[in-house]
């Protein structure tokens, strides 16, 4: 969406979903799901598309694929445009089976679900005889029903010459080789055609091209960015009754009270003027920027962790420059003592969401996340997805394998690729620069060149998705009102059972651009080790050391270390 806006292109937001008849009537061991193209015509349609995508994962996930049924489509059909689909659609599969009567019935069901005027019949030109056969029936049924055709391209790669790279990618996905592929496309026509190529391909049905413009004009979706969707914090009752009710204390007032208590606890009573002045300044900035609730939310789950005996880190990053965070015991680093700047953490001249990274013991991290989920509602809390891309080393090994070479062949080439620098792997462009070891090998050996040519076509492609190691999003409303969710494999628990988590379908940056509150719950094994060490000391001496009061200039300690 943002890329289109930046380049002056009107975005058309859509999703190819897997559609089934009825989740409730699904026969055991049998799963028939088909492709269906859905486009958002307006903001309501976009919200419904988000809901459908989420429900497909959260309610219809089976055998590694999400799916929605016709009842769900009808429930969320407002504002959607449905295209009859590619060869893998139910509509085309009926035609392939020589059952045009069933295809027509399915078309009627689609029109009932999203509205007659919102269904278009797809014709495609991909060089497959079965597609040409389907096109004849698609045209006939569309005209019988009085609905327009629309010319589409089933795009799987950008340029025609990318066909071979796509074939290699399919082999990577299916763990097969190019000589014996498990899945193959029979033509090289599944690329993104130019407008002239589309016009030439559908010259037989010029109305199919006109419909593409009609649909583009109908689709008008604006995604609101830059909001602050921070949940309200349930403050205690003030003059009236009930948290967050009519008599609830204002968030700013409650935060100020907690900071005042923290100032006395940290600096003594009376509070030193320097500390009071710094706290007043920070509270003013926090209030003006609308982040009172943010600090209360962080204070609350950190307090829960400490009250529950879960080890919490002393603070990391720019948040250590905040006296408010120090007084709330979010951090244990005195910014006055160490002359740390608040503006590095929260700058009134640059409006952006604050970012406090919290460290918890690995053993306790899940309990903290569970607490936050229960407090703000499981519909409003999720972990954030992350996408793993194919970088040169992995792409080289995969390319060698799909070409049928032994593992050692690809591994030898991969080892010629330099190590990542500050976490960033080098690109093939950098690896093939003059003087680089990989370039020399490619120039010397034809097999190496063939492998690297295939690997370059795989570079940058998303290989898999996983759960971000730390990031959790907390919303002021159900997340499916804002963005789609899915489930992700979180590995096995202590009993060996597979664990699945609800995660966002959007990665970190889009989540933040939508204005959602993102928190980092980092699990540090160091904290577990320290806790175990303190337990050993307590058992041996009867006293448990307080880490926050240990002297930093203890001579015997330094003598032991050096």
Residue ranges and their predicted role:
Residues 1-562:
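Alpha-helical scaffold/interaction cores of sigma-54-like transcription cofactors
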């Amino acid at each position: 969406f943002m890329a289109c806006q930046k380049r002056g292109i009107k975005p058309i937001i859509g999703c190819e979903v897997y559609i089934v008849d009825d989740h409730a009537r699904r026969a055991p061991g049998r799963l028939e799901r088909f492709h269906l193209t859905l486009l958002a015509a307006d903001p309501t349609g976009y919200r419904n598309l988000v809901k459908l995508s989420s429900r497909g994962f959260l309610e219809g996930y089976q055998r590694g694929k999400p799916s929605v049924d016709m009842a769900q489509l009808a429930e969320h059909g407002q504002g959607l445009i449905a295209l009859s689909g590619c060869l893998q659609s139910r509509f085309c599969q009926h035609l392939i089976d020589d059952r045009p009567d069933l295809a027509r019935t399915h078309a009627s069901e689609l029109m009932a679900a999203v509205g007659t005027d919102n269904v278009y019949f797809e014709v495609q030109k991909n060089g497959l005889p079965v597609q040409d056969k389907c096109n004849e029936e698609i045209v006939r049924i569309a005209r019988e029903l009085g609905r327009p055709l629309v010319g589409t391209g089933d795009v799987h790669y950008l340029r025609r010459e990318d066909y071979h790279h796509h074939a290699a990618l399919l082999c990577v996905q299916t763990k097969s080789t190019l000589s014996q592929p498990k899945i193959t496309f029979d033509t090289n026509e599944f690329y993104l055609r130019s407008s002239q190529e589309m016009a030439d391909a559908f010259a037989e049905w010029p109305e199919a091209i006109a419909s593409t413009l009609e649909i583009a004009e109908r689709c008008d979706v604006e995604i609101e960015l830059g909001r602050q969707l921070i949940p309200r914090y349930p403050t205690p009752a003030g003059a009236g009754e009930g948290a967050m009710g009519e008599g609830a204390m204002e968030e700013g007032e409650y935060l100020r009270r907690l900071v005042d208590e923290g100032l006395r606890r940290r600096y003594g009573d009376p509070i030193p003027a320097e500390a009071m002045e710094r706290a007043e300044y920070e509270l003013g900035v926090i209030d003006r920027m609308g982040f009172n609730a943010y600090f209360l939310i962080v204070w609350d789950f950190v307090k829960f962790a400490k009250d529950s005996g879960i080890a919490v880190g002393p603070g990391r990053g720019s948040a250590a420059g905040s006296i408010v965070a120090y007084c709330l015991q979010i951090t244990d680093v005195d910014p006055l003592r160490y002359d740390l700047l608040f503006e590095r953490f929260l700058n009134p001249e640059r409006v952006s969401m604050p970012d406090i990274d919290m460290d918890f013991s690995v053993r306790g991290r899940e309990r903290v996340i569970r607490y936050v989920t229960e407090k703000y509602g499981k519909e409003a809390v999720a972990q954030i997805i992350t996408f793993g891309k194919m970088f040169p080393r992995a792409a080289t090994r995969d390319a060698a394998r799909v070409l049928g070479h032994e593992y050692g062949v690809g591994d030898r080439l991969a080892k010629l690729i330099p190590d990542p620098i500050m976490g960033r792997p080098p690109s093939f462009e950098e690896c093939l620069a003059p003087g680089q070891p990989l370039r020399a090998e490619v120039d010397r050996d034809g097999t190496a060149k063939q492998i690297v040519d295939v690997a370059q076509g795989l570079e940058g492609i998303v290989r898999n998705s996983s759960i971000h190691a730390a990031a959790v999003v907390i919303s002021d409303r159900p997340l499916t009102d804002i963005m789609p969710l899915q489930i992700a494999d979180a590995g096995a628990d202590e009993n060996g059972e597979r664990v699945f988590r609800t995660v966002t379908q959007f990665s970190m940056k889009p989540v933040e651009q939508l204005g959602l509150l993102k928190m980092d719950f980092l699990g540090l094994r160091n904290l577990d080790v320290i806790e175990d060490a303190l337990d050993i000391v307590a058992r041996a001496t009867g006293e448990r050391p307080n880490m926050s009061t240990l002297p930093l200039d203890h001579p015997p300690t330094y003598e032991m270390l050096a």
